[in-house]
């Protein structure tokens, strides 16, 4: 009975993406899930067979509700399975294999770059006539104008070991022969277009790319129409050589020739637009392609999905994906398609959907797909920031080995990011030791400031034992100085000792910060300083935060430099006021506000991003309101209404709540007017 599920139930199942029947297949190894699916289908068999329209609609509603309940149960089961897994841990053999494979990948890449890319001619046979052979310079004959050579004569002329066709030919030689051809006026006159396509199919793509526009011009001058096959060959060659601007030029020339649209031409053009970052043009091309009766190719649709992802048009990307799954008859989503959609899930902060897509591509009943390194890298990225899925993200390293995939530099980047957000300090130290201290691989993948950002992020996320007594900042700095001065080896960006307690963590953070100041002072931008301060803010170490703010921040604020160092000051003020708000330290927060305002009034700060200033003002409004200084908060709010900022109930909600508690009806009315009425800013601007 389960195998005969049909009719409207099937349509509903498709609308729910494969419905209970396919979910039954996906979860066939889980007894709990399969029982749920069987019960769901059996309970609705009778309802499906109803002939009364009213009862049929009611049955559909019931089925829809049960499907939603079923999906929720599947979701709960999945989350329970995730939570039951072992703590974040990578088996030693998997970790060792990962380190060695990344090292071997890097060495192979270096060897490839050092040997160069000597592209040889293609292995396809050269099937062209003697006239074109003569003009190319491959066939020597007194009667160069004749095209009546016998096949045996051509073969005997080409059989000599010294001829171009019977030995490996350098790119320079092919370029020379192609220039010889293109220098002849109307060089393709009298030559069949099929022979021309065969000839260019034989040449290396770099040679074709270099002269692609001249080839187009020569074909037109010879009085021939450019066939789509030849255009696609030219565009594929320019794309393969990375000369995407020539691909765009070729497409525009093709448009001017009033030639009919071609799916492969669209595909090559889409790849070029995607590579050039012209995502808006690619979105327009997608609309143009839909208006013509041409079935799009898989590569074209993948390029469109990538464009919609870059332009943040995620709804359209899902439409293309669903078209490939449900509507298109000759194409279906590839592993690359799933990788791109997982990337979109990451942008939409939906790790659960990303994991569903990964399972779907592996378990779909028809043509299941094998994951690629690209897919797994994107899935690690999507899962890394959500604590619920970090165990699953680490287990993906085993999937790489299971499917015979090799990690690459992107895998290393995603793993460092995952380690940072999961707080696995031992793994972070191991990676830094292998790929930064022993060999300088990391700086070629990440900027130095990104590496420090991930180190600080790992220190924020790490789980350690709380220390009963925390020494002051001076004590930590003195200990760090002793470690640095007594070290006989070159400095490394982390302490090798284990980090078991909060004091160990603080010592490691201060050591890394001192290392960055000494070795990479140019990397200490606004993000890193706030990351460093955020370690103590997140740990609730108010006293250490204050000491670092007073000593390190003041020290940096006197440094001469660019607006980046000014942004550093502004962001640090934000963190100082935020700490005062969280830990009820009004004096510290108000002093930080006054210092910021002093620098701003006396123009000690260059013009900065408006969002920074608004953030400082909003935090100060909350700080004043929380400490019952509502009149000061109202004055501060009124003085900034002419800034053109967006005010809403969320940003002013805390201030309104505190003013309501204080029975300050004037300020409550002011906030309600600002957040509810259009043009209210004109009423409350300064005279």
From Swiss-Prot:
Annotated NCBIfam families: PPR (TIGR00756)
PANTHER family attached to this UniProt entry: PENTATRICOPEPTIDE REPEAT-CONTAINING PROTEIN GUN1, CHLOROPLASTIC (PTHR47936:SF1), PPR_LONG DOMAIN-CONTAINING PROTEIN (PTHR47936)
Name of the protein: Mitochondrial 15S rRNA processing factor ppr3
Keywords: Mitochondrion, mRNA processing, mRNA splicing, Repeat, Transit peptide
Phenotype of gene-disrupted mutants: Impairs growth on galactose and leads to thermosensitivity on glucose-containing media.
Family statement: Belongs to the CCM1 family.
Nucleotide-binding among keywords: no
Gene Ontology CC: mitochondrial matrix; mitochondrion
Note: Involved in mitochondrial-nuclear incompatibility, a major determinant in reproductive isolation between species, through hybrid incompatibility of Ccm1 and its interacting partner 15S rRNA between yeast species.
């Amino acid at each position: 009975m389960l195998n005969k599920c049909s009719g409207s139930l099937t349509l509903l199942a498709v609308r729910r993406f494969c419905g209970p029947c396919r979910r039954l297949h996906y979860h066939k190894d889980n007894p709990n899930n399969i029982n749920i699916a069987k019960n769901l289908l059996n309970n609705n068999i009778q309802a499906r067979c109803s002939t009364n329209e009213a009862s049929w609609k009611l049955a559909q509603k019931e089925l829809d509700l049960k499907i939603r309940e079923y999906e929720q149960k599947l979701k709960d089961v999945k989350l329970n399975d995730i939570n039951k897994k072992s703590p974040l841990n990578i088996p030693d053999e998997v970790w060792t294999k990962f380190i060695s494979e990344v090292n071997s990948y890097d060495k192979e890449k270096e060897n490839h770059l050092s040997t160069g890319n000597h592209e040889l001619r293609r292995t396809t046979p050269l099937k062209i006539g003697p006239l074109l052979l003569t003009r190319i310079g491959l066939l020597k004959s007194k009667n160069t104008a004749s095209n009546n050579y016998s096949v045996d004569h051509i073969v005997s002329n080409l059989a000599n070991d010294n001829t171009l066709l019977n030995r490996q030919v350098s790119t320079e030689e092919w370029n020379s022969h192609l220039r010889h051809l293109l220098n002849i006026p109307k060089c393709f006159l009298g030559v069949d277009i099929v022979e021309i396509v065969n000839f260019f199919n034989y040449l290396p793509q770099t040679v074709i790319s270099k002269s692609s526009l001249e080839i187009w011009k020569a074909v037109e001058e010879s009085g021939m129409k450019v066939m789509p096959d030849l255009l696609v060959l030219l565009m594929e060659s320019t794309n393969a050589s990375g000369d995407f601007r020539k691909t765009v030029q070729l497409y525009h020339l093709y448009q001017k020739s009033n030639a009919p649209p071609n799916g492969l031409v669209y595909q090559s053009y889409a790849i070029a637009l995607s590579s050039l970052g012209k995502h808006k043009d690619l979105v327009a091309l997608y609309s143009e392609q839909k208006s013509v009766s041409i079935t799009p190719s898989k590569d074209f649709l993948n390029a469109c999905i990538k464009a919609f992802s870059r332009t943040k048009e995620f709804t359209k990307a899902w439409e293309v994906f669903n078209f490939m799954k449900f509507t298109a008859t000759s194409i279906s989503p590839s592993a690359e398609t799933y990788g791109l959609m997982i990337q979109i899930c990451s942008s939409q902060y939906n790790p659960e959907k990303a994991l569903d897509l990964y399972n779907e591509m592996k378990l779909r009943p028809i043509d299941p797909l094998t994951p690629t390194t690209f897919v797994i890298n994107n899935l690690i990225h999507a899962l890394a920031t959500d604590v619920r899925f970090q165990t699953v993200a680490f287990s993906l390293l085993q999937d790489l080995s299971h499917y015979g995939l090799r990690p690459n530099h992107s895998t290393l980047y995603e793993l460092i990011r995952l380690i940072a957000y999961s707080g696995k300090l031992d793994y972070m130290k191991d990676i830094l030791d292998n790929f930064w201290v022993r060999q300088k691989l990391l700086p070629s993948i990440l900027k130095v400031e990104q590496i420090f950002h991930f180190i600080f992020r790992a220190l924020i996320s790490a789980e350690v034992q709380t220390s009963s007594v925390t020494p002051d900042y001076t004590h930590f700095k003195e200990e760090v100085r002793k470690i640095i001065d007594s070290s006989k080896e070159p400095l490394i960006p982390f302490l090798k000792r284990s980090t078991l307690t909060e004091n160990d963590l603080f010592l490691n953070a201060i050591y890394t910060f001192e290392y960055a100041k000494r070795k990479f002072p140019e990397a200490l931008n606004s993000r890193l300083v706030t990351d460093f301060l955020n370690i103590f803010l997140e740990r609730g170490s108010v006293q250490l935060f204050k000491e670092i703010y007073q000593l390190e921040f003041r020290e940096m604020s006197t440094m001469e430099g660019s607006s980046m160092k000014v942004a550093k000051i502004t962001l640090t003020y934000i963190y100082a006021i935020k700490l005062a708000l969280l830990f009820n330290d009004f004096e510290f927060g108000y002093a930080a506000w006054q210092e910021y305002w002093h620098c701003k009034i006396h123009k000690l700060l260059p013009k900065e991003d408006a969002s920074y200033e608004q953030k400082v003002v909003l935090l100060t409004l909350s700080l004043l309101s929380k400490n019952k200084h509502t009149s000061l908060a109202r004055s501060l709010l009124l003085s900034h209404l002419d800034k053109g900022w967006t005010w809403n109930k969320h940003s002013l909600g805390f201030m309104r709540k505190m003013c309501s508690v204080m029975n300050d009806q004037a300020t409550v009315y002011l906030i309600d007017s600002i957040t509810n009425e259009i043009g209210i800013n004109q009423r409350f601007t300064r005279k």
